[in-house]
Amino acid sequence: IRKPKDYAVQEPGDIVQVDTLDLHPFPGVHFKHFTARDVVSRWDVIEAFSKASSRQAKAFLSCLIERTPFPVKAVQVDGGSEFMAEFEQACAEYGIRLFVLPPRSPKLNGRVERAHRTHLDEFYAVFAPEGDLESLNKNLRSWEWVYNNIRPHRALDNLTPKQYIEHYHPGLISSQSSHMY
């Protein structure tokens, strides 16, 4: 289902864009990097998997729900096969609306595409994965924490996503947020 034109995006969690990125740190090693970006607060959740299937996308959805300090109401994805079957079912079970973009329209998922660029430039440019998925995800989790809690964002008037939420949407911060990392 495409996002209705009148669907209002006003607070964190109204729409979270989700996408994958192919990583080839060196010959013979391949990872799928999943990124979720909240379009209002720029809060990111990132995780790497060995491949991108609907089972991994479902697992990533669980990571997203666990690591956001606000309820996720809707996710927006491209039409990739990883966002079908088990992922669609998981969205329905969690009560999360699923919006699927038309084919070949990455500009409509621009926030998460920009997030990929930031993670490539600021994380992967300085951290070289060794081929160990567990180690990569441990380091990605540390980077995610820095990104959401320490790194200022120009788009948020130099606030961090956490500061932005606390300042503009204080009622959304859930009690689980202190246990996220």
Residue ranges with predicted function:
Residues 1-8, 12-14, 85, 94, ...:
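C-terminal domain-tail junction helix/linker
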Residues 1-37, 56-59, 70, 177-181:
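Mobile-element integrase/transposase regions
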Residues 20, 39, 51, 79, ...:
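Residues immediately flanking
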Residues 36, 111-120:
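A structural motif
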Residues 46-70, 74:
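Active-site beta-loop-alpha junctions of metal-dependent nucleic acid enzymes
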Residues 52, 70-85, 104, 157-162:
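Acidic/histidine-rich, metal-coordinating catalytic segments
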Residues 74-79, 93-111, 127-132:
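RNase H-like polynucleotidyl transferase catalytic core
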